[in-house]
Amino acid sequence: MTMNLSFELPFPPSVNTYYRSSFRSRSVYLSKKGREFHQLALVGLMELSDAGTSDTLHPSFPTERLRIHIELIPGDRRSFDIDNRVKAILDVLEGHLFVNDSQIDELEVIRKPMDKGKARCRVTISEIKEQSNS
């Protein structure tokens, strides 16, 4: 049986505002927007948890090859590059719903029509079954 998991997350920040760097310590860290997105997204992911009361999520797809479908639904008419939003989504899912983003073989990102004031993204993760080459 192929496992599918669908859920919504807050609209992710652009990768341009997701990270900040410290020239003094030469390190890269999550920006305030990045941390806020992670916190809100993890609250939503905890609701998906089988345990419900657990403080941690265990990957639902520990070793499977994955297909990820992302629908970006903006809350206003401002333009944005869809590829700048994917990194934040995959980062928050990695370690919580799958072990590593190297498991992803197919990634589809679609811009949906604006839903005024209700920016969000829909994510569907599907297991890819091995196909025989007969």
Kindly label every feature range from the protein language model:
Residues 1-134:
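Acidic, proline/glycine-enriched N-terminal capping motif
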